């Protein structure tokens, strides 16, 4: 199998338990780009992550096209996020145009992941205007940091599947 587009969100402790070392873990993640992504493929990379920059450099050296995503200067740049009890509003810039999207996703990391996925769709050939219009209809995945109820004290009750101790921290911080 050869992929046309692959995405890199981040390099964290989340799945480290499957690998003997961090180096082995990064080599496994990098394998998606150097063994499965085709030479003419698109690498969509979060460049706010230090390992994202390492991966970006490696993909460019192989001649793969790269689309960058992040808060720093990027092809798809996150300009701001505002949060409320129903989700977040994301302001971003892509191809010289600003887009504002309201989505029912709790937590900054979910907005960042959404934009990385959007970058993958753009790399696959979608038109930006149609894509950002479609993002407005995104729905949340139950169990992935959603707010199914409000307690009698008016405090929100959150449900989040966090498979490792390392994944509890960003979920907790998002609330």
Can you name each region flagged by the protein language model?
Residues 140-143, 160-175:
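Active-site beta-alpha connecting loops in nucleotide-dependent enzymes
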Residues 2-156:
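Acidic, Mg2+-coordinating active-site environments of NTP-dependent enzymes
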